[in-house]
């Protein structure tokens, strides 16, 4: 966000090669509409993004999960026991202060995940989120949560994206 804020307020730097536009969606569109910024290439890389993922160990331990959508997985918090209260499911969210934190918190609320028996885990930092994935993947335990790609974690642990199962853009 600091690079975007500097560009928007000071006009420098001239170029931002990697901006997650969804993290600054409204102010970016306003800056473009007002002529302060220009989007030179709207989609330089395809097939990338962010979303909800599971580890291959999840599929090995819960074979029926293969091909399921997020909406279907949300009916099974028992597959991802929360350490502090195993009667609830653990969903690993986005680190505090990141743009994706609000999006994931809103999805958690919109999908009524708490009512379904889920707990939204704040990993505290990118390292905390990576650590939760590494620990689950290396031990073969189920893991369900937010992540993005391309990243070394997605490649190293062969994380599997979970389709939403609903159409967000009608």
Where do the model's predicted regions map?
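Pocket-flanking alpha-helical
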Residues: 1-34, 131-135, 152-158
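Ligand-binding pocket segment of bilobal, Venus flytrap-like solute-binding proteins
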Residues: 18, 92-169
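Structured segments of extracytoplasmic/periplasmic soluble domains
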Residues: 4-10, 27, 31, 76-80, ...
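A conserved helix-loop-strand patch within extracytoplasmic ligand-binding domains
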Residues: 24-93
